[in-house]
Amino acid sequence: MYKFKRSFRRRLSPIGSGNLIYYRNMSLISRFISEQGKILSRRVNRLTLKQQRLITIAIKQARILSLLPFINNEKQFERIESITRVKGFIKK
């Protein structure tokens, strides 16, 4: 029996060699945060373990220094406002 070799293509990291993982680099950090403001997992980010650790530390530092919100509730407030508007129209 013959064993076929599967071709394995290594995926490029979303963080280039020129990008600095730093809490002030908001354009880089914002790519690794969900819409709710949560840190995305390593599988979703496709980062190495070391890069994920550095990103996590940078995000936490940015949150503590108020550069990033801990939780992003903007969409939740929009939904509540639209529900109250609909209820107001029904009463009248």
From Swiss-Prot:
GO CC, any one term: plastid
InterPro entries: Ribosomal_bS18, Ribosomal_bS18_CS, Ribosomal_bS18_sf
BP-aspect Gene Ontology terms: translation
Subcellular location: Plastid
GO molecular function: small ribosomal subunit rRNA binding; structural constituent of ribosome
Domain of life: Eukaryota
SUPFAM superfamilies named among the record's database cross-references: Ribosomal protein S18
Residues in the signal sequence: none
Keywords: Plastid, Ribonucleoprotein, Ribosomal protein, RNA-binding, rRNA-binding
Alphabetical list of HAMAP family matching this protein: Ribosomal_bS18 (MF_00270)
PANTHER family recorded: 30S RIBOSOMAL PROTEIN S18, SMALL RIBOSOMAL SUBUNIT PROTEIN BS18M
Family classification: Belongs to the bacterial ribosomal protein bS18 family.
Subunit structure: Part of the 30S ribosomal subunit.
Protein's name in the database: Small ribosomal subunit protein bS18c
Organism: Epifagus virginiana (Beechdrops)
